[in-house]
Amino acid sequence: MAAAPLKVCIVGSGNWGSAVAKIIGSNVKTLQKFSSTVKMWVFEETVNGRKLTDIINNDHENVKYLPGHKLPENVVAVPNLSEAVQDADLLVFVIPHQFIHKICDEITGRVPEKALGITLIKGIDEGPDGLKLISDIIREKMGIDISVLMGANIASEVAAEKFCETTIGSKVMQNGLLFKELLQTPNFRITVVDDADTVELCGALKNIVAVGAGFCDGLRCGDNTKAAVIRLGLMEMIAFAKIFCKGQVSTATFLESCGVADLITTCYGGRNRRVAEAFARTGKTIEELEKELLNGQKLQGPQTSAEVYRILRQKGLLDKFPLFTAVYQICYEGRPVTQMLSCLQSHPEHI
């Protein structure tokens, strides 16, 4: 007898979550391995007097977070988290990283023991020994195997089906290949590697570098300066991974889409860069700019810089990571944006 088709639930429905829902909803229609209905947990909000879940289920568009892109009709928005994940075999986590503890606590025990997860969440947490990855939190709280997906993937471009690459990191290769089958399309090409921790760390740390790039744009420094931010940021990303990742760190992973490609696209086209540029030019706070420019969605770069700053301070390593440190101090300690240039001029890479 053929195995029952695998039920998929997407946990999250923001900009990126909705773009991924478009891919998965379309793919499962022709893949017999997966159930043809995809549930998507939606944090209920009211938009123009209507519930967001009603809009998605009737008009098949997330008008708040991914306007202008139709979702397949087999993607069903569910406002109740427990109901959304019930009996799901495959969980796709795509929420702001600061909510992962609460979400895991709420759904642990409600999914089958053999369920598999993949996290698209770009962020890290602080643990007693320093670094704690989002995948570690999910694995420890829920007891399921978890893969990661990171890459040069601006959500609106993915939703518009413009060509891009991405990277899946999975410690169990067959699980990574299963998620590749679920997610790959002719215009969304996936490489699977086993260096999962490095893949995940790239996705978090590049947002800090992008904030630095945005500061430089706000100061009108030019392309040469931004190239230096990208290079020095990459050096700090590699150094951080080699210090804090428990397993082996392959430098080759930084050449995958999750590494240098994602870093470049985020430093030129992402929301972290855009908000950081506005921060440098307007003097408004990050919180004000989130409301103004991001429809209230949370920016990951500044928050990740705060977590990284605490981890580095705990280990006495702040002076080894001047770019990461400068981003935190400018965002949260009121240091002038020009400190970004000072940190580049005196970077230990040049000494």
Swiss-Prot record:
UniProt record, GO biological process: carbohydrate metabolic process; glycerol-3-phosphate catabolic process; NAD metabolic process; NADH metabolic process; positive regulation of protein localization to cell surface; positive regulation of sodium ion transport; regulation of heart rate; regulation of ventricular cardiac muscle cell membrane depolarization
Active site residues of this protein: K206
Enzyme Commission number(s) from the entry: 1.1.1.8
Subcellular locations according to the entry: Cytoplasm
UniProt keyword Membrane present: no
Catalysed reactions listed for this entry: sn-glycerol 3-phosphate + NAD(+) = dihydroxyacetone phosphate + NADH + H(+)
Domain of life from the UniProt record: Eukaryota
InterPro entries linked: 6-PGluconate_DH-like_C_sf, 6PGD_dom2, G3P_DH_NAD-dep, G3P_DH_NAD-dep_C, G3P_DH_NAD-dep_euk, G3P_DH_NAD-dep_N, NAD(P)-bd_dom_sf
Entry's Gene Ontology cellular component terms: cytoplasm; membrane; plasma membrane
Positions annotated to bind NAD(+): G12, S13, G14, N15, W16, G17, A155, R271, K298, Q300
Keyword set, alphabetical order: Cytoplasm, NAD, Oxidoreductase
Binding site for substrate: K122, R271, N272
MF annotations from Gene Ontology: glycerol-3-phosphate dehydrogenase (NAD+) activity; NAD binding; protein homodimerization activity; sodium channel regulator activity; transmembrane transporter binding
Subunit structure: Interacts with SCN5A.
Family: Belongs to the NAD-dependent glycerol-3-phosphate dehydrogenase family.
Record's function text: Plays a role in regulating cardiac sodium current; decreased enzymatic activity with resulting increased levels of glycerol 3-phosphate activating the DPD1L-dependent SCN5A phosphorylation pathway, may ultimately lead to decreased sodium current; cardiac sodium current may also be reduced due to alterations of NAD(H) balance induced by DPD1L.
Entries under PANTHER family matching the protein: GLYCEROL-3-PHOSPHATE DEHYDROGENASE, GLYCEROL-3-PHOSPHATE DEHYDROGENASE 1-LIKE PROTEIN
Protein name from the UniProt record: Glycerol-3-phosphate dehydrogenase 1-like protein
Species, as recorded: Mus musculus (Mouse)
